[in-house]
Each structure stands twice: as structure tokens, then as C-alpha cells.
Amino acid sequence: MKANSLLLCAMLFGAIAAFAQNQGVLTGQVLDKNGLPLAYATLQLEGSVQGTISDEQGAFLLKVDAGNYNLVVTYIGYAPVKQAVVVAANAETKLTVKLTEENTALNVIEVSGVRAKTASATRTLLEVKDIPQAIVVIGQKTIKQQAAFDLTTLTRNISGLNFTGNYSGAGSYQFFNARGFDLVNSQNFRWNGMMIWNLGNNYADNIEQVEFLKGPTSILFGDVAPGGVLNFSTKKPLADFYTAVDLKIGQWNLIRPAFDISGPLNKSKTLRYRVNTSYQKEESFRNKVESERYFVAPTIAWDITPRLSWNVEAVIRNSTASDDPGLVSPDGTVAGLDRLDPKLYLSEPSRKYKYKDQSYFSTLTYRLGDTWRLRSVFFYGNTKNRPWGIWPDAPDEDGNLQRNEYGYNQGLKNLSTTLDAYGSFYTGRIKHNLLVGLEYQRSRFRYTNEGYLDSLDQNNLYNIVYNQVPDIAPAETPYLPFVSVIDRAGIYMQDQMMFLHEKLHLLVGIRAGLTTQGNQYKADELPGTDYEGYEDNLVTVNVLTPRIGLVYKPKEWASVYASYAQGYEVNSPDIFALNYLDFSNPPATRSTQVELGTKASILQNRLGLSLTLFQIDKKDPYGFVYLDPANPNYDEYNVYYDGHHRSRGIELDVDGKITPWLSVTAGAAYTDTEVLEDPGYPIGNRLPNAPRYTGNIWLNFEPVQHLKGLTLGAGYFYKNRFFSSINNDPNLEVPNSFTIDLAAGYQFKRFGAQLNVTNITNQVNYLNPWVFNLFEVQPLRRFVLTLSYKFQR
């Protein structure tokens, strides 16, 4: 028996060696007209599913059977190149491919949606269509067509991702829900793959594309809520001089100039710069609401050697916006809101949400040989924000109500660093795409007070009287006698193996993660405070999270996949809960996902489709119940970490061109959520902020001959009704909503003009981000005109 086994192994290895001897290797580099590398160019063997993508230095590696081939090299905005190559057995063929730009009349050609080639958040060079996970990328095409300058406009183009409200009005920060689960401010948001806090408007003019990786992504990012990760990939310096000026003006006294300037700093163009900056000031359809923000982001890229490159970025943001709590219903129902003017303002005009952030990024990339790269990324952020607002109580039948005030200052410092190696190699006929990395993230933040509610004045819903009480802004010092801590460390590895001439892919990966979070108390500051006698309560969790996926590509343009992934969330002790001491060391929340899907590029690769089925199970979630559910008080609740919540559904994303002159970005989602176990709420309840049905479509018409330069766009965005709380209070069920948008523009040489009309039917829609009788009114009809000028040489 042993002899037979040895003979079988010998025959197997002999066969592999024989196969390998009939193969050769294609290596080389893809360059532009300046001799600079083109990252993420597609190299495809004509008539085959075999292909690859160039890395950040333009390098590529492809192992194929000996023979004659046509190698097709494509890159967005460049003329494709077809090159005949001869591959000899047991030999290496080196190529240098130079691409030239197409004449696009200064229009940047962008591919986004599900047709995007790569997503930087995957930390690999794999094409999106080859990854066993649903990924959607929103790029410049959508940003420009929809004249977007906030996240709510962009994210409505992604199926299964729902905007659920603002913290303190449109000028603060946004809440999102994905696949039935809320995204967490300290977990689910990334900038160039590095964790950032969601405490301000994260849209910025230096964003090249917004990437959404759906489902649990703990293997790459550690403890994150299972709905998905939202990553912002920034613009990089260009080798040629480029200037873009953009001015938006519109209703509600909007004025928004923006500048994008880039070019080389030396003759060899190895040192390049880019600066994005903007200023925005506007009022609102809501009475007495206004906001002002400015932004600047300088970037330097330096190709130190042909193998070593360094990219340094700074992002400075500053915003001030009116507090806007929304509306309270006269009778506690959504229907009762019809009795109120959507413009009614219930806060104080002097109350502002202030946000300041300075972020710095350093990315060092070194190419090891022709197919490996080593990358180190460092990020540091310093954030200060000051919520200061009003929380109105429910009114009596005559409209009398009490207004409460809150306010605090918060300081936050965030540091992250990653080191990863990624490369491709072969073992016999099996191609490996290996990613190995280390990651560390550290956050420290403090508050000046707990943000409790204090009574401000007695008022009336139908006749609000402002300025009854003198304003006293929240003190900037002292901080509370503790520091909130988050420390994350992880080591991860994944390999996507390609078999059968790359028709069959197997992805396996695992992450070992260590997270510590909680509160560290300062002994010298405790005496005389409510926290006297408290001790450090830090929760440490060690978790192994696996990931496995299978991809089958019957054709180069189509793939089907199945995947399984695990995720986790570390819960900090809730010091504001009345039963805080009972849960000073809460357990982690665990999640699992099974996903099946298919991706395809049809109509001669013009139109991309992604269809996904998924099920996510979340166990031991954080939950809370108010002491008096019928009359809940903001700060009177108990917490628990128990239960089983499930979400499953179907998602469709479509992006591309139906014809050469008609493009589409569309999506639809069916999301079925359910409470399977929960000590606080009935089994069978739906999860909050998760509409059962959502849909979106944006059509854009651009003539290619007659009337060239004209663009016409139209969009429809629908959201089914949903509950704002897990107790499924029918009075707080947010009704169905929709908006219709239109756009018309014209581009003449370097000049452009575009008019966008949002919510043209003037629908009054609501959200309820706070579970209480407090509804956020969504924007009414608005006209925005964009004037643009571009110069490039």
C-alpha cells in the first residue's frame, strides 16, 4: 500500500513537471508616452480567459503554454495595442508595451460600477470580476453626471447600501445601513484602505472613486460590522500638466468653487504633484439652516528609482453647520407630519456642529523583481468636533413641548500603519496570487462631558420662539477623566489560486486579529467626579477569521462564484447604561456570510452585470431596552449582548453602455431581515433601517456624432418603507419614498456647463435615525448649475 502511494505521488509530480515543461513565461512592463508605468492595465490573450493586470510599476507576469499568441493590452483613455508574441517552452519572453492616449477632448473616461477593473481596498491587483465578493465602485463618471458633492448622492447608486440619516442635520455626518446591518463609525469607513472615523462629511474633491466591498471583510480590516466597508480612493498626481476649475451655484444660495491642479516637478516627470481644494457655502430649504466648509489636499508622488516610489498626501477639512434635529410629529405618527411645514426649524440658529480634521498619508511601494511588490502605508489623523444642538420632546395635543440642549467637545487622534507583500508566482500550472500583511491601528479620544440632555425652554410646535435663553457654548475643557481606547493589530494571508488555464479560481485566507478597546481612567482626575472609584475597563479579543471562495470562468467575460466569510465586532463597555457594571467586559459580536453570485461583461464588454445572493447571520449583537419603553428617556436604558439576527437577500448592479450613446447605472436589492433570537424584542421582528426593496437607475444620453458634447441624464431612486427601530413601532415606520432627478449639459472644447435638478417632483420624504418621534426631512426640489474649465498639455 505504501509503495502504491509513493508511486502515485511520483506519477502526479511527474505529470505536473511535464506540463510545466511545455510552458513559458511572459513578463514585462506597460508604459505611457513619457515612459512612466501604467498601473492596472489589462493584458489578455486573445480568445482565452488567461490574462493579468499590471502592478503599480506597470509590471506583469503571465505563464502560458508554448505557442503563438496575440496579446491585447488595454487601458482606459488609451488606444488598445495588439501584439503578436511567441512563447517558447521553458523560456522567458520579455516585453515592453507603450500605450498612447486617445483624443478624448479633455474628457476623462471613467469606468465605475461593477465594470471597474480594480478596487484598491482589496489590497490586490485582481480584477473585480475575479474576486468572489460583491464589489461596486463609483467613479468620476457618476460623480460628474449627478453633480455629486456629498456621500448621500453617491451611495444611492449602490444596491443594498442605504443612507439612514444625519447625526445633527445635513452638515454633520451620515449614517448608513448595508445588507440589513448598520455601519459603525469606528469600523466600516476607510480612506485609501486606512481606518477613519465617520465624524464629518467624508466626500471630498480629491476622491477618485468610492469603493464598497459588500459583506464581512474582517480578513482584511479586522473587527467591522458585517454589512460592508466603504473605502475612499484618492486622486494621484499626473505626469502631464492638468488644471480643472469647477463652480457650482444653485438654489439655497449655494456657491462651491473647486480646483484640481496637477503636473510634473522635474523634466523626467518622476516627481509630480496634485492639489485639490474647494470651498462651499449654502443655506437650506429648512428655515435658518446654513453650512460652510473648506477643503485642501496637496499630494506629492516621487518615483525615487524604477522600483521604489513614494506618495505623500495631506487632507485638511473644516466645516461649520447649523444643528437641525428635524421635526417632531404632533401625534407621534408619520402621518401627523403632514400637518407641519417641512421647512419648520426646531433648534436654535446659533447652535452649530463644528468639525476640524487633519489627515496625513504616506505610501511607500517597492517592486521586488517583476511580479512582487512590498507596500507600507502610514496614516495619522487629528480630529476635533463639537456637536451642539437641541433635542425637542414630543408635544402635547396643543403643541406645547420642551426643548432640551446638549453639547460637548471631542478630541480624537488616530494612527494606522500597514505592511503587505503581494505577488504572483506559479507552481506547475497553478498560478498563485498571494497577499500577506501586517496591520496596526490605534485610536485615542476624549470628551468634555457625556452629552446628557438638559432642559432649555418651554416652547410650542406651531409658534417656535427662539433665543429665550442666553447661549452658553460647550466648554472646551476639562475633558472627562478617562480616555477611550481602540487598539487593533492583525496579520493576514490569502492566496487566490488559478487552475485550468485560469478558468477555476480558489481563494483561501485567514486573519489573526487582536483588538483591545474600552476606557482608561486617569487616577489623578477621578476625585470629585461621577467616575470616582472607577477602574480601567479594557476588553481584549483574539479572533481567527477565515475566508474561502470559488470562482469559475466559463468565458473571459463571465464568472460565477461562491464564498464563505466570517466577521466580528468588539464591543466596548457602555458606561452610560444603567447596568454598565454587569457588562464591563462584553463579548464580541460574531457574524458569518454565505454568498453566491455571477459577474458578466456583455455587449462587447460595454455593459457590466453583477447578481448576488447572500445570507448573513449575526450573533450576540449589542442591544438595549429603555426602562419605560412607552415613554423612553434618552439616558435610562439597560444593555445586553445576546441574540441572533439574520439578513438575506438578492442584489443586482448594472453599469455601462447599452449603446455607444446611452449609458446606465442601475441597481436593485431585496433584503429580508429577521430577529431569530433576542431577549429584548419579539422574534420575527424586522431589523431597523433595512428597506425590503430598493431600486435605482440613472440613464445618460451622449450623442457620438450629431450634437456631440450634449449630455442628458435622468434618474429614479426608490426606497421601500422600513422600521427605524427593532421594536417595529408602526408609528415610527418610515414610508415609501422616491426621487426623480434630471440633468442636461454641454461640453465645448475646454468649457462645460451642466444643470442638475434633484427631486424634480418635490417629494417630501422622511428618515428617522434616532428611533424616537424625531424625523429628518429630506431635501426638496433643487437646481444646481455647474460651470467647468479644463486645461491639459
State what each model feature region is.
Residues 367-369, 373-379, 383-389, 587-648, ...:
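Membrane-embedded beta-barrel scaffold of Gram-negative outer-membrane proteins
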Residues 280, 284, 297-367, 380-412, ...:
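Acidic/polar loop-and-plug regions of large Gram-negative outer-membrane beta-barrel proteins
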Residues 303-305, 412, 431-433, 439-441, ...:
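Structural signature of Gram-negative outer-membrane beta-barrels, strongest in the C-terminal barrel
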Residues 130, 137-140, 154-157, 173-216:
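Periplasmic plug
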Residues 29-36, 41-46, 72-78, 88, ...:
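Short, acidic, small-residue-rich periplasmic hinge/interaction motif at the N-terminus
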Residues 206-208, 219-296, 304-308, 358, ...:
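Outer-membrane beta-barrel translocator/receptor signature
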Residues 618-619, 659, 664, 717-727, ...:
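C-terminal beta-signal and adjacent terminal beta-strands/loops
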